[in-house]
UniProtKB/Swiss-Prot annotation:
The chain crosses the membrane at residues 23-43. PANTHER family: PHOTOSYSTEM II REACTION CENTER PROTEIN K, PTHR35325. The lineage of its organism: Eukaryota, Rhodophyta, Bangiophyceae, Bangiales, Bangiaceae. Its main location: plastid. Belongs to the PsbK family. Residues 1-8 form a propeptide. It is found in: Plastid, Chloroplast thylakoid membrane. GO terms for cellular component: chloroplast thylakoid membrane; photosystem II reaction center. This is Photosystem II reaction center protein K. PSII is composed of 1 copy each of membrane proteins PsbA, PsbB, PsbC, PsbD, PsbE, PsbF, PsbH, PsbI, PsbJ, PsbK, PsbL, PsbM, PsbT, PsbX, PsbY, PsbZ, Psb30/Ycf12, at least 3 peripheral proteins of the oxygen-evolving complex and a large number of cofactors. It forms dimeric complexes. HAMAP family: PSII_PsbK (MF_00441). It is a single-pass membrane protein. Keywords: Chloroplast, Membrane, Photosynthesis, Photosystem II, Plastid, Reaction center, Thylakoid, Transmembrane, Transmembrane helix.
Amino acid sequence: MNSALFLAKLPEAYAVFKPIVDILPVIPVFFLLLAFVWQAAIGFR
C-alpha cells in the first residue's frame, strides 16, 4: 500500500524534469551528427 502511494506521487515529483525527458530521445542523433562532423574534419580516413 505504501509503495503504491509512492509510485502515485512519483510523476508529480519528477514534473520538474519533464523538459529534460522530452529532450533525451534526441541525444543519440546529436552523437551521430558529432561522429559525422568528426569524420568530415579528419577527411573520412
